Amino acid sequence: MKKPYRKISDYAIVGGLSALVMVSIVGCKSNADDKPKEQSSLSQSVQKGAFVILEEQKDKSYKVVEEYPSSRTHIVVRDLQGNERVLSDEEIQKLIKEEEAKIDNGTSKLVQPNNGGGSNEGSGFGLGSAILGSAAGAILGSYIGNKLFNNPNYQQNAQRTYKSPQAYQRSQNSFSKSAPSASGMGTASKGQSGFFGSSRPTSSPAVSSGTRGFNA
């Protein structure tokens, strides 16, 4: 049975309905934008999840092309033809469990030197490792964070899960801006890269199927 694919509009470019969908996903259901308490609540909610877009590569691996804070965690997969779909909670948990087993036995490319190989075909990251290398991995896979936190190979490989240095930097900036300044835990450590090596939230919010995103 074929899984349904949905084209996800660029909310940053397309106005109207896309903007309304964005508002609903970050949990701002009120039209009273001038209330300080509501703004404070919104600021806190975006730290609970991440919206991540993974793009399939020619070698069938996956790269993070965009991610930013969201009230709930959404993972969108874009195939080579540009079709996009949102992974279900069950799919995500299955992928994380499979990758955890690889981490335990040392076969995960996240913990191998130089991404587990050179530039040969198939040396890229699969869906599970791409998820755990993203911001969503720090949230959904927080329970295995200790297995990765001090791993120097992970610290390097997590950056390689991004399609470009610019995509990685945009993510860092986006999550740093959304972090609470008073806690002293809002920005990633300059000495570490990757999301298990930063001060990302470690709560595990429910995964929700979203219907919007934007092209990198």
UniProtKB/Swiss-Prot annotation:
Signal peptide start and end residues: 1-27
UniProt topology in membrane: Lipid-anchor
Biased composition, class Low complexity, residue ranges: 198-209
GO cellular component terms listed in the entry, alphabetical order: plasma membrane
Localisation: Cell membrane
Keywords carried by this UniProt record: Cell membrane, Lipoprotein, Membrane, Palmitate, Signal
Location, primary (coarse class): membrane
Annotated Polar residues bias: 159-196
InterPro entries: UPF0323 (IPR020913)
Lipidation residue positions, type S-diacylglycerol cysteine: 28
Domain of life of the organism encoding this protein: Bacteria
Keyword Membrane: yes
N-palmitoyl cysteine: lipidated positions: 28
HAMAP family named among the record's database cross-references: UPF0323 (MF_01421)
Family: Belongs to the UPF0323 family.
Name the UniProt record assigns to this protein: UPF0323 lipoprotein HPAG1_0235
Record organism: Helicobacter pylori (strain HPAG1)
